[in-house]
Amino acid sequence: MTIEHKRSSKGEIEDLIKARYSLIWITSPEETRVEESLRKLCVEREMRLEVWSITEGFKTIANGQGTRDVKDPMKAIDHVMRAEGRALFVLRDFHPFLKEPAVVRRLRDAATELRKTKKSLLVLSPITKIPPELEKSI
């Protein structure tokens, strides 16, 4: 599901998570505002929030700690798949990596597998650039 970020989108994101959407795309240039909304949502739903970037790897928003050595996009997806418990994972600026067929395939596989879990994967990007192969998964 693709969402243009706006004030009311927190409820929409919560509905998608409750409905077990495993792969969500949010388009917004306001990273900080979106992540703060997601943090509040995760606190309310008692979920862990981990945010990934190519420069920092994963960090858990609640305590700032994380797996900083996971900077490769494929390893980031693998990290999400291996993680346990209820969690929301945010991939910042992931759209450039979707030019790689292996990354697209791995995301499709992840979307299918994550439906069986209590985890969701959210792509946060300033632009909407979804490969056709992923359109039905997002």
Language model regions located:
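ATP/nucleotide-binding catalytic cores
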Residues: T2-I138
